A protein has these predicted regions:
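Core of compact, soluble alpha-helical bundle domains
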Residues: 11-12, 25-161
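N-terminal export signals
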Residues: 2-22
């Protein structure tokens, strides 16, 4: 928690250092100041990676999600070797969805999730884990709503039952 808050504080300080200058330049040009992107407001990739790290670890041990035989099997046999890469992919996906300078290069979401036959209930439980991670790191409700909206937009690609 301290590392992520420290990373967010560093990112926040950097944003404060950058945005006033861009706001002044915007005033001089007659354009409204640029509003920080969701990516910036989440603390950039440091803040996003901290949230991804937490909710990814919680998904592995979540009893609702572990009722799904395919997820449970993956957690028992694949997670140790593949979870670090999955966390990287999730960080890229969220960073891109939040307006960051990254492009998600993983499998299309429907192909990545097909083998798990995820239900709407399981999708909602992953969303709840994301919100719990955002709360853990003190992310404001506005940013939570925006990120959850991006997550929910992927539901038709992820849910198969």
């Amino acid at each position: 928690r301290t590392v992520a808050k420290g990373a967010s504080a560093v990112a926040g300080a950097a944003a404060l250092a950058l945005f006033p200058a861009s706001a002044e330049a915007s005033v001089e040009s007659g354009k409204p100041p640029r509003r920080p992107s969701l990516y910036d407001r989440l603390g950039g990739y440091f803040g996003i990676a901290a949230v991804v790290n937490r909710f990814s670890d919680q998904i592995i041990i979540n009893p609702i999600l572990n009722r799904n035989p395919a997820l449970r099997a993956w957690n028992e046999t694949e997670a140790e070797a593949r979870l670090p890469g999955l966390k990287f992919g999730r960080t890229l996906w969220i960073a891109a969805a939040a307006g960051g300078p990254f492009k998600y290069t993983g499998l299309p979401l429907d192909r990545a999730h097909r083998e798990f036959n995820l239900t709407a209930e399981e999708f909602a439980e992953v969303g709840a884990e994301i919100v719990r991670a955002l709360n853990f790191f003190g992310v404001r409700k506005r940013e939570q709503r925006e990120l959850v909206a991006a997550y929910r937009a992927s539901m038709s690609d992820v849910v198969t039952e």
